[in-house]
């Protein structure tokens, strides 16, 4: 695999195990400070380790998802009750002095800010400690966090089984709540499984086995996507796969082609048989070595079929390289829980950051106020709250190594201008951290030029301090007096101002009264700014009003220098930044704590290279770092090979938003600090990336960013010699249980990496009101060339149609497996979600240029290639002489690399992605080339930037939400009208039938007397004929009256349907026009974005050309720079003109496509109107016959049993049967067409 370590990694991860004590349960008193409640409960954990559960006072089972537990604490770190009543009940103040050891606090929550504290007190001694340790192990288990799809479904089943009511039964309402997106669908699935489905009912646990639950899920969430996969891989209509088909599928589709076949051999028949035995539920299929669709579905969700290999999750990289060789998980302003101006500071944030894998936290320390004079942490010159430094250090000592044993860096931003309080800070560090605090450098790594930094392995369990260091200059130095004099003057002025004002908080400014001469860090140091400068801008009104709050511009300037020394360039303007614009100088006590992380002011990469001190590091605000990244990217990479660099957000991010960390990982910056309290895409990417390598907080940088003999340009667009590029295709097939609402869902696929590798906002269409089991199965998203896969990450995220976040997953590109896989989604804080998942298909492989594909195929299957050569030789022998054939064979063998013919694919299984066109590779010209690009290359550049915008097809617009709502309303209106007509028709029919029956009875009575004598037979016959004639005329009148009513009703329905059709056509036309307007707006935005992107590419090429020119002959440098600028202007003008021409052509194509859609709509309108008129006419023509048949029937007595007669006899309106329902179905079909 690209970027993998040689050999097979020995997996160290272990699955979660629940000890007997937790399964059996223990007695605790659960107490709550807010409600003053305390209840005796029995805590238990289910055998799988999914949930912590207990029975509350209402006899309902409460559960806590163990994966949401962020920490467990006992002893002095657990929360103590403050309520006197609770303290009395728990026994505090009594003779038992070991009560603290019985306390346990469970911290849980969806993110580090919104945490919930559950407080327990064990009844027996030592119970709390066992529970705290075991619960924490379960919560932090990496395999549990990355469980298979089947495991998460089993987890949902376990929750339902645990949450029983007082009778020990499973309430149906809990099932409806778990699958709340479509409750009707849930009820139908429960009923089809023979289970109770009424909300008020409950189910016996023995009736709800795991097999029944799986059957319920299959009924609830139909899977046509898996049926299609089975068909594609060779089932061919059969409901099963044979052993050979399954083995071929796993070896050809599910196998990573980048793996070595010796170290990772293909699946053998015996192994495939074991998979069938594990996943196939049907015994008959099992006996025949076959896998059914249900067994295949289980296999896809099994642990063997994860999207990532387990070694990617394990601690699998070399941890013995210098610290500078790693990306280190870092936090900025760790104490804040919200914004930068008025947010709340919290000690808990330090715990949560460290537990989340952060290895570098920031401490902004300020001088404490009398009388305590305790240093505290806050964000200076803002209204953020304060927390004591001592509490923070104790929290760090408690949690520093609970999730990772590797070193923690304390990044001090020191504003304590009191020698006494700085000494107190140092003493706190020594006493609280003890032996964990690294004070003296390691013997193997002295603080000397050229000596590399120690490794994370060397520093395991150690805490390092980053703080300005005090250096004493040599006594006989030539410029010592020159340095000392201005500093002494500055210090005397500061001392006088300190004596006059005695400020003690950052809100009023903190003068550097303890600044001492000679604090140079080996570099020239400028004068301190007058300490009371910020007060000039306050005025009396500002002082009376309260704390001085900086504006965004001031904050950016302040943050820009927060960890650097003062600017020494007198030409640069100064600003009123307050004392927080620079740290105060360190005293001797704090300086002795600094060793391998010594901050210095950054001057240039050349100066740092000459000093060659690996233990010196510099901090960059993101804007300055971007400037260096843009101007000198390769030098930045070289700097980060030896020394550490820390990047932090600019001060204008007052909302605590984050920059994209990938920008600075690309140049090898180690300490890329982010605001952990803001879970935006940048923080989500950070959390996802640092999940790997055992969540150690350290990720080894790619080899080219570490080796001193290799140079690396992060802006390269070509394959780098020695780095195996990758190709990746991702097809989003379907989703399952993505939301608890009945809404549309869409999926975005992004790639983050080098600029050439980064792709944003690939997106599927939005499903139509289906969040249970949407199926997309669209064209794949293609990433044809990933230049540096070990630094690239894939993000797959699902959203509701309104843009609400559903879940996402961050995957390292170099570890993604090929084939069909479930991606179980995570929340913003990277915690696993139980039910939401996506089924995707991936093709991951080593990148091969198109002109080398034939060579690659020959190397993959050399036997087939040689056989093809032999076959060609034999064919030649039949046409020419034997001797010439031999010569031709030799020639063929000599030139086979140039004459490789087209070969049939060695893979007999068709790919679901074969139908999609392959994206052409990007331009192969180096952006650093100083020659003007050829027209063909420039056209490739335009094509790579330009995105196509196609008009929305009419069929897709018919599914628009507005049209769906209109159709629903029209169908409801038509149903109401028909019900009204049916009632009238049934009433009239009943009256007519009664009249016919009465008339017939009267006629028989009149004829009956004549039947007693035989003398008047002729007269009786005549009377009978007259009676029959009168009866027939009466019948005709009855039929005619019903016919007139039905004709009027049919005409009314026809008129209503015509109105509906015209409304629907009008609404469809409006939808088309709205879609066209939206596309034009989007096209305009795309035009601007493409122009900016083109300009960025051209500017980057110019910068690279200038950099190359500077490294060549200095005498020709000026002339060459002038020529580069001239060519840049010419190429920019020409490229923008070509881009505008291409954009105009794209606009014309879009207009033509939209006109075609409107023309299609215009052509369909008369057809639909004519079709409706014909349907109504035919329905009217059928009325006489239908009414006579319904009213009179075909019986000789004259009274039939047609639908209307039946309805009239039963006394209710007809349902879906009969002649009245035909128009209804026609209307539904007509609406479906729209």
From Swiss-Prot:
Any one GO CC term of the record: postsynaptic cytosol
Renumbered residue ranges of the record's region Interaction with SHANK2: 1231-1234
EC number from the UniProt entry: 3.1.4.11
InterPro entries: C2_dom, C2_domain_sf, EF-hand-dom_pair, PI-PLC_fam, PLC-beta, PLC-beta_C, PLC-beta_C_sf, PLC-beta_PH
Biased composition (Polar residues): 576-587, 887-908
Domain PI-PLC X-box: 318-468
Modified residues (N-acetylalanine): 2
Compositional bias segments (type: Acidic residues): 555-567
Active site (catalytic residues): 332, 379
Effect of substituting residue 859 to A: Abolished ability to transduce G(q)/G(11) G alpha signaling without affecting the phospholipase activity
GO terms of molecular function: cadherin binding; calcium ion binding; calmodulin binding; molecular adaptor activity; molecular function activator activity; phosphatidylinositol-4,5-bisphosphate phospholipase C activity; phospholipase C activity
Cofactor dependency: Ca(2+)
Chain residue ranges for the region called Disordered: 467-587, 887-937, 1198-1234
Keywords linked to the UniProt accession: Acetylation, Calcium, Cytoplasm, Dwarfism, Hydrolase, Lipid degradation, Lipid metabolism, Membrane, Nucleus, Phosphoprotein, Transducer
Span of domain PI-PLC Y-box: 590-706
Gene3D superfamilies: 2.30.29.240, C2 domain (2.60.40.150), EF-hand (1.10.238.10), Phosphatidylinositol (PI) phosphodiesterase (3.20.20.190), Phospholipase C beta, distal C-terminal domain (1.20.1230.10)
Modified residues annotated as Phosphoserine in this record: 474, 490, 495, 537, 926, 1105
GO biological process, one term: phosphatidylinositol metabolic process
Regulation: Activated by G(q)/G(11) G alpha proteins in response to ligand-binding to G protein-coupled receptors.
Record's subunit section: Interacts with SHANK2. Interacts with LPAR2.
Disease: Spondylometaphyseal dysplasia with corneal dystrophy: An autosomal recessive disorder characterized by postnatal growth deficiency, profound limb shortening with proximal and distal segments involvement, narrow chest, radiological abnormalities involving the spine, pelvis and metaphyses, corneal clouding, and intellectual disability.
Matching PANTHER family: 1-PHOSPHATIDYLINOSITOL 4,5-BISPHOSPHATE PHOSPHODIESTERASE BETA-3, PHOSPHOINOSITIDE-SPECIFIC PHOSPHOLIPASE C FAMILY PROTEIN
Function: Catalyzes the production of the second messenger molecules diacylglycerol (DAG) and inositol 1,4,5-trisphosphate (IP3). Key transducer of G protein-coupled receptor signaling: activated by G(q)/G(11) G alpha proteins downstream of G protein-coupled receptors activation. In neutrophils, participates in a phospholipase C-activating N-formyl peptide-activated GPCR (G protein-coupled receptor) signaling pathway by promoting RASGRP4 activation by DAG, to promote neutrophil functional responses.
Protein name listed in UniProt: 1-phosphatidylinositol 4,5-bisphosphate phosphodiesterase beta-3
Taxonomy of the source species: Eukaryota, Metazoa, Chordata, Craniata, Vertebrata
